[in-house]
UniProtKB/Swiss-Prot annotation:
Name this polypeptide is given: Leucine--tRNA ligase, cytoplasmic
CDD domains: Anticodon_Ia_Leu_AEc
Gene behind this protein: Lars1
Source organism: Mus musculus (Mouse)
Motif 'HIGH' region boundaries: 62-65
Entry binding sites for L-leucine: 54, 56, 596, 599
Length: 1178
């Protein structure tokens, strides 16, 4: 904090936050129990149970976690105010591989490098050596050994350095080599950090997962026994993303990169190498050798013309389980070795290493094609990290294949370079396989010709061609080949694949859709694993899950679509693993339940955790009900969570189990679960699936709503430890205070798009909050001087209506969980309404309205900034905590009155702009440019009716609007009709711009812009606020007249809601005003005296030049008894009144503009005042 200037405001907020948190803890405000609520009859307005996916305990919580959980926190804050009994529990997740992997890594580092470890120096050259051939390496001069050490905090490969960056000592770090220490260290820190932001959590219900917590362990075992009993869990070989290094499946949470990536299925087409073999393969004579190509389009294999390899790519030949030799890349062979292709799992028996160029020209037999022999040809764009490195060529349907084949046909030099004979290329033409309506039976040829693709180097055009063809081909394409003629591709694809596999021409091959790296830095493969899996593909289960989703609130259509897509493709999910932390499978204890599977219905455990664990995170303390973990058998859990389950055989007294049951029945289902959108395809979908499986007949226990949010950017950039653009929760609270941070989180964003936490906005928010508290204190101090009596002035009524409208809008925004909008309507716009009232209420603000505003504002802001609001609630002398307050009741809203006030503000803004333009120098020669004299008077003209041409236009538009169900026709139709009306002939240049303006206003304000009269009295609104308008424009006088009294030009331009004005400067005679008071800060000045001036108008004019005068009642004007000689005499100190007469408030000034003389009339007497007067300020 030392680096930041001026922390007084943040320190003030932190101080009141501590006080509020101590108060809530002492009063146990957030601790709720079903039995107590039901006894007190506090559940009449319903309950609200909200949960957040428990964060993983391998580090401190950061701002991203906080943003997601703030959605729960704000929702609970709002629902409390609406009178609901609210429960927000918070657990901490320790299941899975990362903690164990980090602990083991630390252990290895200590074994290898000592304690504390002495790591080998890393030279820059090492960094560069990882660059790929052909990459340009830019040397960063700033990077040497020293900067590496500094950078270790964010991106070190050593676990020791990562722990060091958390501020831990060497002695502390050693303890983390035991996984259990992580469970003791990080969970209490998480609770501590969360408490500093004033989370409305019942901390008695918090727990950590894994078998360290015997109650939770028992709960998860019960869940899995139930799922197995209901046939949801099965055993067998499944295709799974797998880490060979870890020796087990690699689930989403265990991945360094590739979260959400699943296995991609290919058809592995076997292209038999014909004898004579290329010289490189001659040693394998007598063996069946196949080039194996991975394709997503088995239905196009009828059109193969050749096979592609990349000349400069490394390939291997390896022996399969049946003795055949497959040629592909090492990477693909590694995947195949885990899918039963080789004799021994994970072992690739390499029999030959070769470069692609060494098999160019080899002759092949390809299945299904009409060509008996095809050849191996060069393609330079094959990627090593996708497929097998061998690509089968179908130029009729693949733009890439066609472009490469045409290159070879056109370029003799290219064929010569790679030793390709003409007969290997020239006779081969694209073969029609399928027809796409509108494109033809050689789709790739048609599209490549249309886009004028010249060669395989036209990458962008080729990408465009593929995009055009592939989806159209799959959905609209029709087969042309015998046996499948006329059938749609999407219907025959699987059949053709099966036929090829049955004929021994192909196999199923899987690899990850994209690269997946495990947290142990191992590139994952797809493996066929023996494992226990949840059968999410089960048709009935899926159907019921879709039913749950149908009734579930997702708050936005995009989230719903993401859920639908996820539920659609979810099949089997491996729920067991052999490494990490967690609960053992109850019927097969060699397996652990993985972290995405023990976290699907734990919300039910929250309902009873406080009665079992007694507030201890690890579940090691004595249970408040005296229940031991081993007593929680499957039958006991059944009784607690299943309504119709019989009472079990147990030593636990029935009333105690009934207490657990009561808690569950009261709080379930979960009313809201909020989370990042990246959890929709996994955790949140499993959450729905498992609730449906556990309570299949009780849809009233299924999730009610799920709110997904985007990721959080920090200052418009991705949060990243390595770049330093990162804030932990504790750092954010330290920097901005809890409420300052919460305000910025509410303002960061509402949708599933990425939100943005802007530090400058957080700082501005702190200032707003501080200013708000100071203003409340100011109002409390000046309470007695505020206006009382009826609150019925124009601005009183507007302010009351705007408050009521603000309450209603903010209520709607909170209800829809649109928190950025709720902050806008319930704080920013609410404060703006108060500021406007303060500015417009020239007669002073009304006490009742000011204090209603303070109360309402405090409540509306409470979900976002509870500490500050608690402080203000106390300042207001309220006996209870604001946590027991109720949502304010909105009174009537006079929309017409609010619009009349908006009209007033628009007129004031318009007048200021026109005054500015009036004061601009007249256009002309540069030497002539003199600013205009400031006007003193203004006449505002308002129209009762529209000019005739506008009246006719509006009437016409209104008739179209009513005839076309609230829509206006195109401008062409309108112009044609209006142009035919004789009354509008001479106005046609103005008519269509007027129509365009009306259409634009209609989008903003609705159909009322077609009305011929305003809903309020324009003149009355302006007259009631004439003092405000006069003061804000610094004019002497404003009069309001009807346009009918003005000249023709004004009458034609002026229309309802759009007044016109005329500025003018009333002539006057300059008079000196002298202040004889010594050291007063007031000086002599010259002002114009105008016909009919009073003392008050002259003093107001004086106040514009002498800004030191704040109160006109403190100023007195005097005239010299001798107007000619008086001003010439030297003033005598202490005799300011000598030879002068006080001018009474009733005096009227008169001017003779010809002789430039001023006199005043007072009580019927006329007196000359000369060219000088005196003013005294008391």
């Amino acid at each position: 904090m030392a680096g930041r200037k001026g922390t007084a405001k943040v320190d003030f907020l932190k101080e009141i936050e501590k006080e509020a948190q101590q108060k809530w803890e002492a009063e146990k405000v957030f601790e709720v129990s079903a039995s107590r609520l039901e006894k007190q009859k506090q559940s009449s307005k319903g309950k609200y149970f909200v949960t957040f996916p428990y964060p993983y305990m391998n580090g401190r919580l950061h701002l991203g976690h906080t943003f997601s959980l703030s959605k729960c926190e704000f929702a609970v804050g709002y629902q409390r105010l609406k009178g609901k009994s609210c429960l927000f529990p918070f657990g901490l997740h320790c299941t899975g591989m990362p903690i164990k992997a980090c602990a083991d890594k630390l252990k290895r580092e200590i074994e290898l490098y000592g304690c504390p470890p002495d790591f080998p120096e890393e030279e820059e050259e090492e960094e560069e050596s990882s660059a790929k051939p052909g990459d340009i390496v830019v040397r960063d001069k700033a990077k040497g050994k020293k900067s590496k050490a500094a950078a270790k905090a964010g991106s070190s490969k050593y676990q020791w350095d990562i722990m060091k960056s958390l501020g831990l000592s060497d002695d502390d770090i050693v303890k983390f080599s035991e996984a259990e220490h992580w469970l003791d260290y990080f969970p209490p820190l998480a609770v501590q950090d969360l408490k500093t932001i004033g989370l409305k959590v019942d901390w008695r219900r918090s727990f950590i997962t894994t078998d360290v917590n015997p109650y939770y362990d028992s709960f998860v075992r019960w869940q899995f026994l139930t799922l197995r009993e209901r046939n949801k869990i099965k055993f067998g070989k499944r295709y799974t993303i797998y880490s060979p290094k870890d020796g087990q499946p690699c689930m989403d949470h265990d991945r360094q990169t590739g979260e959400g990536v699943g296995p991609q299925e290919y058809t592995l087409v076997k292209l038999k190498v014909l004898e004579p073999y290329p010289s490189k393969l001659s040693g394998l004579k007598g063996k069946n050798i196949f080039l194996v190509a991975a394709t997503l389009r088995p239905e196009t294999m009828f059109g193969q013309t050749n096979c592609w390899v990349r000349p400069d790519m490394k390939y291997i030949g390896f022996e399969t389980a049946n003795g055949d030799i497959f040629i592909c890349t090492q990477r693909a062979a590694r995947n195949m070795s885990y899918q039963g292709f080789t004799k021994h799992n994970g072992v690739v028996p390499v029999v030959k290493e070769l470069m692609g160029e060494e098999i160019l020209g080899a002759s092949l037999s390809a299945p299904l094609t009409c060509y008996k022999v095809v050849y191996v040809l060069p393609m330079l764009t094959i990627k090593e990290d996708k497929g097998t490195g061998v690509v089968t060529s179908v130029p009729s349907d693949s733009p890439d294949d066609l472009a490469a084949l045409r290159d070879l046909k056109k370029k003799q030099a290219l064929r010569t370079k790679f030793g390709i004979r003409d007969d290997m290329v020239l006779p081969f033409e694209p073969v029609p396989v399928l027809e796409i309506p509108g494109i033809g039976n050689l789709p790739a040829v048609t599209v490549c010709d249309e886009l004028k693709i010249q060669s395989q180097n036209d990458r962008e055009k080729l990408a465009e061609a593929k995009e055009k063809l592939y989806l159209r081909g799959f959905y609209d394409g029709v087969m042309l080949v015998d046996g499948f003629k006329g059938q749609k591709i999407q219907h025959v694809k699987k059949t053709i694949q099966k036929n090829m596999i049955d004929a021994g021409d192909a196999l199923i091959y899987m690899e990850p859709e994209k690269q997946v790296m495990s947290r142990s830095a191992d590139e994952c493969v797809v493996a066929l694993c023996d494992q226990w899996y949840l059968d999410y593909g089960d048709e009935n289960w899926k159907k019921q899950t879709f039913q749950c989703l149908k009734n579930m609130e997702t708050f936005c259509e995009e989230s719903r679509k993401n859920f639908e897509a996820s539920l659609d493709w979810l099949q089997e999910h491996a729920c067991s693993r052999t490494y990490g932390l967690g609960t053992r499978l109850p019927w097969d204890e060699q397996w652990l339940i993985e972290s995405l599977s023990d976290s699907t219905i734990y919300m039910a455990f929250y309902t009873v955790a406080h009665l079992l664990q007694g507030g201890d995170l690890n579940g090691q303390a004595e249970s408040p009900l005296g229940i031991r973990p081993q007593q929680m058998t499957k039958d006991v859990w059944d009784y607690v969570f299943f309504k119709d389950a019989p009472f079990p055989k147990t030593q636990i007294p029935k009333e105690k189990l009934d207490q657990l049951k009561q808690e569950f029945e009261f709080w379930y289902p979960v009313d809201l679960r909020a989370s990042g959108k990246d959890l929709i395809p996994n955790h949140l979908s499993y959450y729905i699936y498992n609730h449906v499986a556990m309570w299949p007949e009780q849809s009233d226990k299924w999730p009610v709503s799920v709110r997904a949010n985007g990721h959080l950017l920090l200052n418009s950039e991705k949060m990243s430890k390595s770049t330093g653009n990162f804030l932990t929760l504790s750092q954010a609270v330290d920097k901005f205070s809890a409420d300052g941070m919460r305000l910025a989180l509410a303002d960061a964003g509402d949708t599933v798009e990425d939100a943005n936490f802007v530090e400058a906005m957080a700082d501005a928010g702190i200032l707003r909050l501080y200013t708000w508290v100071e203003w409340v204190k100011e109002m409390l101090a000046s309470c007695s001087s505020l206006r009382s009596g009826p609150a019925d002035s124009f601005n009183d009524r507007v302010f009351a209506s705007e408050m009521n409208a603000g309450i209603i809008k903010t209520d709607q925004n909170y209800e829809k969980m649109m928190f950025k909008e709720a902050l806008k309507t319930g704080f920013f716009e609410f404060q703006a309404a108060k500021d406007k009232y303060r500015e417009l209420a020239t007669e002073g603000m009304h006490r009742e309205l000011v204090f209603r505003f303070i109360e309402v504002q405090t409540i509306l802001l409470t979900p976002f900034c509870p500490h500050l609001c608690e402080h203000i609630w106390t300042l207001l002398g309220k006996p209870d905590s604001i946590m027991h307050a109720s949502w304010p009741v909105a009174g009537p809203v006079d929309e017409s009155l609010i619009r009349s006030s908006q009209y007033l503000m628009e007129v004031a803004h318009d007048l200021r702009l026109r005054l500015k333009n009036y004061m601009m120098p007249a256009k002309g020669k540069k030497t002539d440019k003199q600013p205009a004299q400031r006007p003193s008077h203004c006449t505002i003209y308002v129209a009762k009716n529209y000019p005739v041409w506008q009246h006719i236009t509006l009437t016409t538009l209104r008739s179209h609007f009513e005839a076309n169900n609230g829509k206006l026709p195109d401008n062409k139709v309108i112009a044609s009709e209006l142009g035919s009306l004789p009354e509008l002939k001479k106005y046609m240049k103005k008519v269509m711009p007027f129509v365009a303006m009306i259409k634009e206003n209609m989008e903003k304000k609705g159909p009322r812009v077609l009305d011929l009269e305003l809903e309020f009295d324009e003149q009355a609104v302006l007259m009631e606020n004439i003092v405000y308008l006069t003061n804000s424009l610094e004019l002497e006088h404003i009069e309001v007249k009807f346009a009918s009294e003005a000249e023709d030009k004004v009458r034609e331009e002026c229309c309802p809601g759009k007044p016109l004005n005329v500025f003018r400067t009333e002539p006057g005679v300059p008079v000196s005003l002298v202040n004889p008071q010594p050291s007063s800060g007031h000086f002599s000045t010259k002002i114009d005296i105008r016909q009919g001036d009073s003392c008050e108008s002259i003093i107001r004019r004086l106040m514009k030049t002498d800004r030191g005068i704040k109160d006109l009642s403190k100023v007195k004007l005097m005239r010299f008894d001798d107007p000619l000689l008086g001003p010439r005499r030297v003033p005598v100190l202490g005799r300011e009144h000598s030879e002068k007469t006080l001018i009474s408030e009733n005096a009227v000034f008169h001017v003779d503009l010809v002789s430039k003389k001023v006199h005043l009339t007072e009580n019927g007497l006329r007196t000359d005042i000369g060219d000088t007067m005196v003013y005294l300020v008391h």
